[in-house]
Amino acid sequence: QNPHFIRARPSLIAKARRADLIICSGAGLEVGWLPILVQKSGAAVQPGAVGHLMTSEYVPIIEKPTAIDRSMGDLHPEGNPHIHLNPHNILLIADELAKRLEAINPNNSKIFKERLLDFKTRWQKAITQWEQESNFLKGSAVVVHHKSFSYFIEWLGLNQVGSLEPKPGIPPTSLHLENLLQQLD
């Protein structure tokens, strides 16, 4: 499901009311529905509580605009929230998630620490393998549909030469696509 367009339906609100922890990307990605969900939820998942985890607060954010207006398209004022597309960010998030789980359920602290260590070992091994397998792509020119791939492009060392969207969130026109094709020739 596209996180830009999730709807805070009654079934989701009911689940949030029972939750000990809400995990979101943050950086404004969930701005259209998360405030309603949190407003109708319990104290455990309110902003500032241990059960309210905005993962973007624990990783380096890219593409933070210095100024913003609607003519620039659908930009995220807090920077690019698609942090999960750089696997190194997942390691940073895992550390914070384990801390939160330990705070919520201290009786299982040892298990959380063991599982974090196991996860980080396996994830780092996977990152190393992915980087080796994709090394030949470094510097390759790519065209994206949306700015959501910026972390991925940065991680793999790709070269974004264009975007199907003329501006973030703005559907492409035939003229824009024609110009993009000419640029790529």
Regions found by a protein language model. Give the residues of each.
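Extracytoplasmic metal-acquisition and chelation regions
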Residues: 1-185
